[in-house]
Amino acid sequence: MGVTGILQLPRDRFKRTSFFLWVIILFQRTFSIPLGVIHNSTLQVSDVDKLVCRDKLSSTNQLRSVGLNLEGNGVATDVPSATKRWGFRSGVPPKVVNYEAGEWAENCYNLEIKKPDGSECLPAAPDGIRGFPRCRYVHKVSGTGPCAGDFAFHKEGAFFLYDRLASTVIYRGTTFAEGVVAFLILPQAKKDFFSSHPLREPVNATEDPSSGYYSTTIRYQATGFGTNETEYLFEVDNLTYVQLESRFTPQFLLQLNETIYTSGKRSNTTGKLIWKVNPEIDTTIGEWAFWETKKNLTRKIRSEELSFTAVSNRAKNISGQSPARTSSDPGTNTTTEDHKIMASENSSAMVQVHSQGREAAVSHLTTLATISTSPQPPTTKPGPDNSTHNTPVYKLDISEATQVEQHHRRTDNDSTASDTPPATTAAGPLKAENTNTSKGTDLLDPATTTSPQNHSETAGNNNTHHQDTGEESASSGKLGLITNTIAGVAGLITGGRRARREAIVNAQPKCNPNLHYWTTQDEGAAIGLAWIPYFGPAAEGIYTEGLMHNQDGLICGLRQLANETTQALQLFLRATTELRTFSILNRKAIDFLLQRWGGTCHILGPDCCIEPHDWTKNITDKIDQIIHDFVDKTLPDQGDNDNWWTGWRQWIPAGIGVTGVIIAVIALFCICKFVF
């Protein structure tokens, strides 16, 4: 009886106690106030949570699949180098996966290749697959090739990124970028209470050259596409070409195009002119370091000598198609009839290029002071009918050059232009010498003439510095695409290669540390204050965009993580393939289990010796390397990089919670006082 009396509580006190507990539970659910005592042994926050992940994963909507471009890792993006990473194969069906956000691409590609019989090499894009919507330069390649396969795959196991769809194959006439797909926690978009932008479909470009979405198309002609003897010609117009023998950047090609126009070096006859650039010229001049971070450089072009051969109009077309022109493409693949965009009619020496709504004026290539001619040794050149004829040959000596300056300065509200004034051109008269050329002329001599029929004989001598990867992948062509890929992956994880890991990283410091992403905008959502320093709220209302800045190369680490994960998955693929073969072998053994003529191996012969390789250690080493690089690595303090907004806004949730607790306690005391 005494014990029962102790356990019983007065009815009024029980009501007050229950009300107090319900109030605590309610505020705990609202403000996430912990009910227990938290100390160091029960709560541990990692460096990533403290320093980087200010935007926590509050919902699964923030977890986005993002397409990361391979060019962010510093891979070669020129057309001769990029095409060596692709190969044809039959018997493998294409795979397509979707992704939600993509990275802005500096270089994209568009292929229209035909077989010698006129049939198409690449399949048409299925319904729903559109071109990659954010490309600074679109390299459009037309031509012919053997195309030994049904589909064109990536030899390194990467995807071809289209508009929110990643495919394992290349589609005809559809712009794509090379990349991989990774998952990121993107900051949650803030509500815009002043305007609500409707949901719009992505567009490839705009007609406004000052827009950050402006895209430029550069056109090429290719013969022997997909082979080691592929020849590429940069198209200036339908009769003027430039032979690509080294790693030409898009900016150099644009400046070269401007120089050819303004100096009057285009073909003014019915024959084709094929230019050959002096191999001593630095073709990397004007290279851009991705979208936002430009290289401030001043280069002086050395005196150069260009030679060309006038090709008769009776000669065979280079690619079997009517050539197109280089043009600025505002979303369509139409060609231009003149050079109004690439070089204005008044021969202006200024090429306007744009990035993210900010202009950068690039002063054009050179000022021609004198153009001299020199006679060539008399040789003969066979014509189309096996006869010899004279060909006018010009040796152009550009003896004076001006500095080329690319100067890009960021401002908070407006675009900037280069301080270099426009250069002027003065082209002198050209004098022709009636000479003959020989088919066996050495093409390395810039003073001699070249022709499209024989310029591939020594083209490899001038660009050996960027053909290593392509020749390695093509050295074992009989093994097939997947075998080559697996062999390359296996080579990446050997002990000797890992010992040189730091040296490789230091030798290739071209990783893009910034992730400039685009994604389809949600209904009624717009950009918040987090992105105002770079783009302003909801630029054009088309994309939710941002620039993620992280210390210590976190984005570079993410790129490397995605690549290493891909390599590990390739090993899993090989292990699965071998296990499948082993299963077939076991099936055969079971089929002959009742046969007693020497056993299974005697019946199956050499097939009995197949044994699946154990790749567990290699995969484990790769995972350990990822853990060492991205988990155990300490991060620097980011306190110095916090501005006033990101510095105090992180205390808002804590302030709201403390204020709520104080209000709850005051309300509780008032209620208790009123009850009593």
UniProtKB/Swiss-Prot annotation:
Residues linked to a glycan: 40, 204, 228, 238, 257, 268, 296, 317, 333, 346, 386, 413, 436, 454, 462, 563, 618
Protein's UniProt keywords contain Membrane: yes
Keywords, sorted A to Z: Clathrin-mediated endocytosis of virus by host, Cleavage on pair of basic residues, Coiled coil, Disulfide bond, Fusion of virus membrane with host endosomal membrane, Fusion of virus membrane with host membrane, Glycoprotein, Host cell membrane, Host membrane, Host-virus interaction, Inhibition of host innate immune response by virus, Inhibition of host tetherin by virus, Lipoprotein, Membrane, Palmitate, Secreted, Signal, Transmembrane, Transmembrane helix, Viral attachment to host cell, Viral attachment to host entry receptor, Viral envelope protein, Viral immunoevasion, Viral penetration into host cytoplasm, Virion, Virus endocytosis by host, Virus entry into host cell
Residue spans, topological domain Cytoplasmic: 672-676
Organism expressing this protein natively: Zaire ebolavirus (strain Kikwit-95) (ZEBOV)
Disulfide topology: C53-C609, C108-C135, C121-C147, C511-C556, C601-C608
Ranges annotated as biased composition (Polar residues): 314-335, 447-464
Name the record gives this protein: Envelope glycoprotein
Residues linked to a lipid group, S-palmitoyl cysteine type: C670, C672
Region (Mucin-like region) residue spans: 305-485
Sequence ranges of Low complexity compositional bias: 414-427
Region of interest (Receptor-binding), residue spans: 54-201
This protein's domain notes: The mucin-like region seems to be involved in the cytotoxic function. This region is also involved in binding to human CLEC10A. The coiled coil regions play a role in oligomerization and fusion activity.
Stretches in topological domain Extracellular: 33-650
Record-annotated site: Cleavage: R501, E502, D637, Q638
Residue numbers spanned by region Disordered: 314-337, 370-478
Swiss-Prot/TrEMBL GO biological process terms: clathrin-dependent endocytosis of virus by host cell; entry receptor-mediated virion attachment to host cell; fusion of virus membrane with host endosome membrane; symbiont entry into host cell; symbiont-mediated suppression of host innate immune response; symbiont-mediated-mediated suppression of host tetherin activity
Family assignment from sequence similarity: Belongs to the filoviruses glycoprotein family.
